């Protein structure tokens, strides 16, 4: 056989071999995971923490879920009150559209934002983070973005299951439209909150209700079916969610209450994204939902939506909500606020 033909045959054989190998699951060796040196000391401290020992434990009764909820709300409320005090933000409970909300106002509302309004949908895997604890992300946005924010304290199981939370978000949005132009408003949230914000867009669009001028989608829980590379690559590396076997997966299914989790109102990545408002998405390189964020960003772009993606070094799931003194936290919200400023009318 001529030398050139032999080389071609060898390359073909190697190609077939590699293709066959790539079709199989890969096993990677155990290795240490260093804390990066080029992030803030605050983020380094978060990155270095071990995963919670009880990450794979969750209640198996409605009473157990309710107790977990009360405990989470109590600790989250303390965090929110202290954060609002540090950042000079006022938080006032009120009702919009029959739903309990909190009006979150910075001490230094930007002149350009006087007629603008943001609506925030809280995180918590659909079952945690209610009450005044629901205001943490709104407080950060108010302080660092200089916007007035309405934090939606939507209903959660075991008191109310899918689609109650979605109904509440849409009800607040429709109420907000009575006093503000849709182009003057944005909706944002993290994790389950981001998924609910997207689902609210589908519901509003289907009902002929105007959509906001922009969206902020932080580490969105966009796919409950388990699709996504980072569910494997960041398992046990993300020290917040930890893995799909952790708390958040059963919590989301508890909310779904037997409903098909591939429904776009639960897994919005499978919905029709065309015509949605401009969106900014946020994640971290260690986030278990990094792939959900990246895949959603690509699908938004493929659907003709103006979408921007920011990914932060070494962050696990939504760690920008955990320390208001970190420069990365300020940067996350300043980037989102800048995006909103470009897309909202005044």
PLM feature spans:
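Bacterial N-terminal signal peptides that target proteins for export
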Residues: 1-9
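Conserved, well-structured beta-alpha core segment at the onset of a catalytic domain
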Residues: 5, 17, 197
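Intrinsically disordered/low-complexity terminal segments and short unstructured peptides
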Residues: 9, 60, 76-78, 89
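Bacterial N-terminal signal peptides
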Residues: 9-19
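Alpha/beta-hydrolase superfamily serine-hydrolase fold, recognizing
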Residues: 24-65, 85-346
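Short, basic/low-complexity N-terminal boundary segments at the transition from targeting/disordered tails
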Residues: 63-78
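Short linear motifs in intrinsically disordered
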Residues: 79-85
